[in-house]
Design a protein with these regions (language model features):
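C-terminal partner/receptor-binding element of secreted or periplasmic proteins
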Residues: 114-156
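A short, surface-exposed beta-strand/turn
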Residues: 97-123
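Basic/polar N-terminal segments that are highly enriched at the extreme N-terminus
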Residues: 21-28, 152-156
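A short beta-strand signature
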Residues: 87-91
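N-terminal secretory signal peptides
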Residues: 24-84
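N-terminal secretory signal peptides that target proteins for export/translocation
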Residues: 1-6
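Short, cysteine-centered beta-strand-loop-beta hairpins and adjacent loop/turn segments enriched
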Residues: 78-81, 92-104
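Bacterial N-terminal signal peptides
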Residues: 9-20
Length: 156
């Protein structure tokens, strides 16, 4: 009878040993949500702008240094694969309210928060006599990978 009681206790405690093992190996990676992505973007933009609120960015295709003002984060922001998250934004050219850049940001976890790991100009402002300013895309996404439309690619 005592032996049976010991066997029952061992089997009863067996599932708990798995929990101890999981804790020893580290917790599962944190899942980040819309609010987390937007908060990370707000922190990044706030930390990056200068004293006048200007966001400076080197255009990875033209090499031009851009001086921009943040307008908005587009919905939806999302997780694109594994631990990579994505946000698309609009920035206005200083002194030209209708002239907008669409800037994309890739974020990854660093500890318990997301940080920006890559930034690209997705759409650049172009002017049309009929329509005024519009955003001309440089690339599209195929299976969440960047594919340049016109053969443009970033400069080293």
């Amino acid at each position: 009878m005592a032996r049976l009681a010991r066997i029952v206790r061992v089997f009863a405690l067996l599932p708990l040993s798995g929990l101890a093992l999981a804790a020893a190996e580290g917790a599962a990676p944190r899942t980040f949500y819309v609010e987390d992505i937007k908060a990370a973007m707000a922190r990044h933009i706030e930390a990056t702008v200068d004293a006048e609120g200007t966001f400076h960015l080197r255009d990875d295709v033209s090499g031009e240094r851009l001086a921009l003002q943040f307008v908005k984060i587009h919905d939806p922001v999302r997780r694109i694969d594994g631990d990579t998250y994505f946000a698309c934004t609009d920035f206005r050219v200083l002194g030209a309210p209708g002239k907008l850049y669409d800037i994309d940001f890739w974020l990854e976890p660093e500890g318990d928060r997301l940080v920006v790991v890559d930034t690209k100009v997705h759409k650049e402002p172009r002017h049309s006599l009929l329509y005024g300013w519009y955003k001309q895309p440089r690339y599209t996404f195929v299976d969440d990978e960047v594919v340049y439309i016109y053969g443009d690619s970033p400069r080293p």
